[in-house]
């Protein structure tokens, strides 16, 4: 009787075991960490999915409004719109010092940027606090960038 119970439990455990690890099943097209590690940081564009950003003049006011809302919700606790450093650096003139691709990659790919990008590492040394990953989409990062451009005086 004990053997039958043991065999029954073992059979159920084997039947419920997955064939593949879940991450391969759900995300087959996602690059592995070794692929990400091979990416060399472009000092002007950073590391991430954003390779080229086309900026328009005049500013896209809808994007500016959405960027302001995202800033207030996810960024304002650590960043100011002036040069004042709170937890993170102030945002004044960021778009004059950095390429738009770098800004967007820093927002959307912060962990890799802080680990591998020399400019992001300098900011980390200055602030001594890692910027948390806010899970900002590329579209939302573009809206934040447009808001930052307005903050820096772009028209």
Regions found by a protein language model. Give the residues of each.
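C-terminal capping alpha-helices of c-type cytochrome domains
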Residues: 101-106, 129-155
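Short pre-active-site segment immediately N-terminal to redox-active cysteine/selenocysteine motifs
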Residues: 63, 71-74, 82, 130, ...
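Bacterial signal peptide processing site
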Residues: 16-20
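Protein kinase-like catalytic domain
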Residues: 79, 111, 148-152
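Axial heme c-ligation environment in periplasmic c-type cytochrome domains
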Residues: 86-94, 111-140
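Gly/Gly-Pro-rich "capping" loops immediately C-terminal to redox-active cysteine motifs
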Residues: 64, 68, 79-109
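Electrostatic cytochrome c docking/interface patches
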Residues: 23-70
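Sec-dependent bacterial lipoprotein signal peptides
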Residues: 1-14
């Amino acid at each position: 009787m004990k053997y039958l119970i043991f065999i029954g439990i073992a059979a159920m455990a084997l039947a419920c075991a997955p064939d593949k690890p879940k991450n391969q099943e759900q995300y087959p097209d996602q690059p592995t960490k070794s692929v990400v590690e091979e990416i060399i940081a472009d000092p002007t564009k950073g590391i991430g999915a954003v390779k080229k950003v086309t900026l328009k003049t005049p500013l896209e006011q809808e994007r500016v409004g959405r960027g302001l809302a995202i800033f207030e919700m996810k960024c304002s606790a650590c960043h100011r719109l002036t040069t004042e450093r709170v937890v993170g650096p102030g945002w004044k003139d960021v778009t004059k010092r950095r390429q738009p691709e770098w800004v967007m990659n820093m927002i959307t790919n912060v962990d890799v940027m802080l680990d591998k990008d020399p400019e992001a590492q300098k900011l980390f040394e200055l602030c001594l606090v890692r910027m948390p990953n806010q899970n900002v989409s590329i579209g939302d990062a573009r809206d934040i960038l447009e808001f930052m451009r307005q903050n820096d005086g772009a028209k």
